A protein has these predicted regions:
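Short beta-strand-loop/turn "lid" adjacent to the catalytic site in phosphate-handling enzymes
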Residues: 56-116
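Generic structural signal for well-ordered alpha-helical scaffold segments
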Residues: 75-83, 152-157, 258, 274-285, ...
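Short glycine/proline- and acidic residue-enriched helix-loop micro-motifs
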Residues: 52-66, 207-214
């Protein structure tokens, strides 16, 4: 089955589209990547997303406009992927949409909202669309995140020791696969979320991120600011757990800066970069990780990757590209896998990874132009993911 996966993370800068041929072969899921592309959000849509995200107030009119606008942007990305990556022929589109709110109270996820109306994608491509992949896990008592955990688990099972997959997006998350134990997946804390917010704030929106970590490299870590940030109760909560920009946003950072002697801008960026490295390393040490496989936009920040290396001496860190899974496309491919599992009647989560009471089939299906015909249900889920 040829599947297109679409993803936009908490950095909300672009839609990542990836295509793959997926085939079940015994206890293995075979994945042949067909390529990936990145489609930036239009400036006005990105500005509306930024103006609507927590802690901002909004209106139902803005939510409706976003649902249509994001759906249309995802439809454009899907059409490009269909044309440029699939030579015009595919079977399924899987759309994560854009997370606008992840509702957490006292550590319990009450709901999650991803916008991007899938009807626009189905109409543009003519293909069936699997979307809204997080809500079913939440309804089953889970965190609804991180959903890359199942794909990570299938990939890591072939590695020795206790490997972990690390995704460095707006939020950092890890999946740990220890021998003889159920897989564990959780958000460790902010990756690019606070960094990007700080850069935009201090440059008056003149820059969106710290390119190559150059400004962090020019700064010095503030012990007072780092200590204050590490005191956040989130880091002491047990896994599985999830977080997002509902917690780690610009006002959160500004409150922290008000509480300590104010560092220079580059020192703030150095401290935030070190915060990500420390919280990732703490999570890995707590679970005996022996190897780290990293992906996501944060892997392009050499200063962040160096700091993670420094915090985890003796633990090799490599990119998912080394395993055949392109780092920039990994999340989009992971959602392609989840949609493939859904249409084959297979669950897309491990309860140990999300905290749900059961493994659930994920998402809702929007038919394409042709009558909806699903594959025959498969009795046994795959045990391994092989990149071919």
């Amino acid at each position: 089955m040829r599947v297109i996966g679409l993803m936009s993370g908490t950095s909300y800068d672009a839609i990542e589209a990836a295509a793959a041929d997926l085939t079940l072969d015994g206890d293995s899921l075979l994945l042949r990547p067909l390529g990936h592309l990145s489609v930036p959000y239009p400036d006005d849509l990105r500005a509306l997303i930024a103006a609507t995200l927590p802690p901002a107030a909004t209106t139902t009119q803005a939510v409706c406009a976003l649902d249509s606008g994001i759906g249309q942007a995802f439809a454009t990305a899907a059409a490009r992927a269909l044309r440029e990556l699939c030579a015009g022929a595919a079977d399924l589109v899987v759309s994560h949409g854009q997370t606008m709110h992840h509702w957490v109270e006292d550590g319990v996820v009450r709901g999650t909202l991803q916008l991007g109306q899938p009807a626009w994608i189905a109409e543009e491509t003519g293909l069936p669309v699997v979307s809204d992949l997080r809500s079913r896990d939440v309804a089953a008592g889970g965190q609804g995140a991180p959903l890359v955990g199942l794909t990570d688990t299938l990939l890591l099972r072939a590695l020795p020791g206790t490997p972990a997959a690390l995704n460095l997006g707006g939020i950092a998350n890890v999946t740990v696969v220890a021998p003889g134990a159920e897989p564990l997946a959780f958000d460790t804390g902010p990756a690019n979320a606070l960094l990007d917010a700080a850069v935009r704030h201090f440059t008056g929106d003149g820059a969106a991120y710290d390119a190559d970590g150059r400004r962090a490299a020019a700064g010095t870590v503030s012990p007072e600011l780092l200590r204050f940030l590490l005191a956040d109760p989130y880091y002491r909560r047990p896994a599985p757990k999830t977080t997002g920009k509902e917690l780690f946003h610009l006002p959160y950072l500004l409150r922290a800066l008000d509480a300590v002697p104010t560092p220079a801008t580059d020192d703030v960026l150095a401290t935030l970069t070190r915060l990500t490295a420390v919280t990732v390393a703490d999570a890995c040490r707590a679970h005996g990780v022996t190897e780290l496989v990293a992906s996501g936009g944060g892997t392009r920040n050499p200063v962040l990757m160096r700091m993670i290396d420094e915090e985890l001496p003796g633990v090799p860190v490599r990119r998912s590209d080394d395993l055949g899974l392109p780092s920039d496309a990994k999340e989009a491919l992971a959602f392609a896998v989840l949609g493939f599992l859904t249409v084959h009647g297979l669950p897309g989560t491990h309860p140990s990874a999300t905290g749900a009471v059961r493994a659930t089939l994920l998402g809702s299906i929007t038919p394409g132009l042709a009558p909806l015909r699903l594959p025959a249900p498969v009795a046994r889920p795959p045990h391994l993911l092989r990149i071919v």
